[in-house]
Regions:
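A short SAM/SAH-binding and catalytic strip from SAM-dependent methyltransferases
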Residues: 138-153
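Class I SAM-dependent methyltransferase SAM/SAH-binding core
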Residues: 69-126
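Short alpha-helix
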Residues: 204-227
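Conserved class I S-adenosyl-L-methionine
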Residues: 3-65, 79, 83, 103, 168-197, ...
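A short glycine-rich, Lys/Arg-flanked "PGG" loop and its adjoining helix->strand segment in the class I
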Residues: 153-168
Length: 232
């Protein structure tokens, strides 16, 4: 019997992780190892997928302008932070990988007056509230990251507190319908996989249904007033 590459990858996911609750510290260690590769792969302007698929729709929903003070969640090497800075916004950008933040600061040094890069843990409410500054954030954004975060409830709750009244939170994520086995769709689970071919370590993905994600939004106090789906 012959198996396609997709069949083998799905079997690998099931063997390595489905149903396990792999934690934040393990994920953090993986991203420390992947940081240099990720910075090299994303470069100054991000990769084609982010530039052509993710960024246009996120920017359409976020509608950034020079008056904005924006929280960039799980910022990686800061490619979207610098994109916002180019449009005049001020940004606080964080990631839980110290190595990634070091690389972001180095790569985006020309935006030092507009972007403040920080290390913070998106699963820890106190760590997140430590990002509070004298001015409330007008907007918050997360590009293709919440599926990499062990527990997003503390994040959603803290972001609501950090935003000004009627502030905007935009996040992009994989569509959960198309990245897991149908019978597993309603069951939160985690698995190992890669995002970019050649990365040193497989990262951990945390599957949640759209229902799970939206209910967390509602519990935090958000009202969903925009939703965009796009094929990759």
């Amino acid at each position: 019997m012959e198996y396609s590459k997709e069949d083998l990858m799905e079997a690998k996911r099931q063997i390595l992780g489905v149903g396990e609750n792999m934690g934040t510290e393990e994920s953090k260690k993986i991203w420390e190892k992947n940081a240099q590769f990720w910075d090299d792969a994303m470069g100054d302007e991000s990769n084609e997928f982010h530039r052509e698929v993710v960024r246009p729709k996120v920017t359409e929903l976020l509608s950034p302008d020079p008056s904005d003070y924006i929280l960039d969640i799980a910022c990686g090497n800061g490619n979207y932070s610098s994109y916002l800075a180019q449009r005049g916004a001020s940004v606080v950008a964080f990631d839980y990988s110290k190595k990634m933040i070091e690389l972001a600061k180095r790569r985006r040094s020309q935006y030092a007056k507009q972007i403040e890069f920080c290390v913070a843990d998106a699963t820890n409410r106190e760590s997140l509230l430590g990002l509070k500054r004298n001015r409330a954030f007008t907007k918050a954004v997360s590009n293709m990251a919440i599926m990499d975060i062990t527990d997003i409830e503390p994040l959603f709750m803290a972001v609501y507190e950090l935003l000004e009244e009627n502030g905007i939170f935009v996040f992009a994520t994989q569509h959960p319908c198309f990245i897991t086995l149908t019978e597993k769709y309603m069951t939160p689970h985690s698995y190992y996989d890669i995002a970019i071919e050649g990365q040193p370590e497989e990262q951990i993905y945390y599957h949640r249904s759209i229902q799970d994600i939206f209910n967390l939004c509602f519990r935090a106090g958000f009202v969903i007033d925009g939703f965009v789906w796009t094929g990759s």
